[in-house]
Amino acid sequence: MQCPFCQHTDSRVLESRSAEAGQSVRRRRECLQCNRRFTTYERIEFVPITVIKRNQDRELFDRSKLLKGVATACEKTGLTALQLESLVDDVEAELQQQAVREVTSTELGESVLTKLQSLSEVAYVRFASVYRQFRGIRDFVEALDQLKESGDGPLPSVLDEPYEDTAQPTIMISPQ
């Protein structure tokens, strides 16, 4: 390792420890030429993952973009930021474990949907509506039917019953 002070190429390691939750190694070094000490970090270099979009454009996988999309779908569902981070961590880990360095946006979206299904049915339907580009109520009904058939989570029994509008109209009269 080259010394940042004198550019000598030989140094000795004084101390090594795990850093960044085990994602890197912190090493304290001493230059054999000038005897000054410096710190280095050793990290795993991940090969970037490319996402192939629907229009065949390619862009680098962006964790923050995925997290933002998932967070939007999960607004007001009671899911914590930690749960969302964990979901995105799982998706990213699956991508890193694949031998192929390209993934289609379809595969990425389906991976997210699979994980959302067990966390929140509302978030699942919201994410699916954007990802699958729902065009009408029929698309929502089909997504709900898929959830119901999968049996992965407890769907409210209200979905088994036909919808009846029992709300009474409210008439407001304002004094003049």
Swiss-Prot record:
Q: Give the InterPro entries listed for this entry.
A: ATP-cone_dom, NrdR-like_N, RNR_NrdR-like
Reported cofactor(s): Zn(2+)
Question: Which PROSITE patterns has this protein been placed in?
Answer: ATP_CONE
* Highest taxon of the lineage: Bacteria
Keyword set, alphabetical order:
ATP-binding, DNA-binding, Metal-binding, Nucleotide-binding, Repressor, Transcription, Transcription regulation, Zinc, Zinc-finger
Q: Where is the ATP-cone domain?
A: 49-139
> Which residue spans match zinc fingers labelled unnamed?
3-34
Task: From the UniProt record, give one GO term of the biological process aspect.
Answer: negative regulation of DNA-templated transcription
How the cofactor binds, per note?
A: Binds 1 zinc ion.
The parts of the chain that form a coiled coil are none
**Compositionally biased region (Polar residues):** 167-176
One MF annotation (Gene Ontology) recorded for this entry: ATP binding
The record's region (Disordered) falls at 151-176
What Pfam families does the database record attribute to this sequence? ATP-cone, Zn_ribbon_NrdR
Q: State the similarity comment.
A: Belongs to the NrdR family.
PANTHER family reported for this sequence: TRANSCRIPTIONAL REPRESSOR NRDR
NCBIfam families according to UniProt = transcriptional regulator NrdR
Q: What does this protein do?
A: Negatively regulates transcription of bacterial ribonucleotide reductase nrd genes and operons by binding to NrdR-boxes.
Name recorded for this polypeptide: Transcriptional repressor NrdR
Origin species, per record, is: Acaryochloris marina (strain MBIC 11017)
Give the lineage.
Bacteria, Bacillati, Cyanobacteriota, Cyanophyceae, Acaryochloridales
